[in-house]
Design a protein with these regions (language model features):
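Single conserved hydrophobic/aromatic residue that forms the stacking wall/gate
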Residues: 1-10
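Short connector loops at secondary-structure junctions
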Residues: 11-37, 64, 92-95, 141-163, ...
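Immediate flanking context of iron-sulfur cluster ligation sites
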Residues: 11-17, 47-52, 139-148, 173-184
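Short secondary-structure boundary/capping segments
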Residues: 28-32, 69-76, 131, 160, ...
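Phosphate/diphosphate-binding loops
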Residues: 33-95
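Short, flexible loop segments at boundaries between secondary-structure elements
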Residues: 77-106, 147-153, 204-223
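Active-site glycine- and acidic-residue-rich loops that bind
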Residues: 120-131
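C-terminal structured "cap/appendage" subdomains that terminate the fold
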Residues: 157-213
Length: 223
């Protein structure tokens, strides 16, 4: 996800990032390193929670780690628990603003339809499809939703021994994206989005780079 796009949208709302969440270590079963990351990052972020701030994650995988995986690994750590209770996915956070305060005026129509992929790590957060809800705020948007696994699975999709399996799993999702024939393809997991884009490139139907939904909102604002 483009951190600059996220920053642009936040600034537009007059709202105001500590270390890796450790998901790559989790995928390699290095639980000791995940625990170290959780301890380090949670203590740093807790400084802001104590001041009344919320923590916003820019990718679905990071949000899943902070909200669910860290507390499972460290159930007796009060700071980790507090962090999980005060963490929001970026799409979730924007929708919280939209529902409570309303977004700042200025969202405009965009120059093509959007297929939004609701990534597995977003669905696992049990927050509903916030990416879809957020994109629906854009006037007259043509929006299609895909809720199937991209097959990437973090490092699973880039490792030589599992890459072919990742491609097989993702083929159906990529075929669905092709059929939608929209200009933009967005996913709240950047690796899933890029994987789908690579699988769909042979027909060149997905003409633009795979992006995060917040980048579509940024484009709608003209930022």
């Amino acid at each position: 996800v483009s951190s600059s796009a996220a920053s642009d949208v936040y600034k537009r709302q007059e709202h105001s990032y500590a270390g890796c969440c450790g998901m790559p270590y989790l995928e390699q079963a290095d639980l000791d390193q995940v625990t170290k990351q959780a301890q380090l990052v949670s203590r740093e972020l807790n400084k802001y929670i104590e001041k009344g701030f919320k923590v916003v994650t820019l990718t679905a995988s990071c949000g899943l780690m902070l909200k669910f995986e860290w507390p499972l690994l460290m159930p007796n750590d009060g700071i980790v628990k507090k962090l999980s209770q005060n963490t929001l996915d970026i799409d979730e956070y924007v929708m919280d603003i939209a529902n409570k305060e309303g977004l700042v005026d200025g969202l405009k129509e965009i120059d093509g339809g959007v297929t939004v992929h609701n990534a597995c790590h977003a669905r696992a957060q049990n927050m509903g499809n916030k990416a879809r809800d957020m994109l629906k705020l854009i006037p007259n948007i043509k929006l299609d939703v895909v809720e199937r696994c991209a097959g990437h699975g973090g490092t699973f999709g880039i490792m030589k021994g599992t890459h072919d399996i990742a491609n097989k799993v993702g083929k159906t999702t990529a075929s669905t994206v092709k059929r939608k024939n929209n200009k933009y393809m967005a996913s709240d997991c950047p690796l899933a989005g890029k994987h789908i884009k690579q699988l769909a490139e042979d027909t060149n139907i997905v003409s633009d780079e795979a992006v995060h939904p917040i980048e579509i909102v940024s484009k709608s604002y003209g930022l």
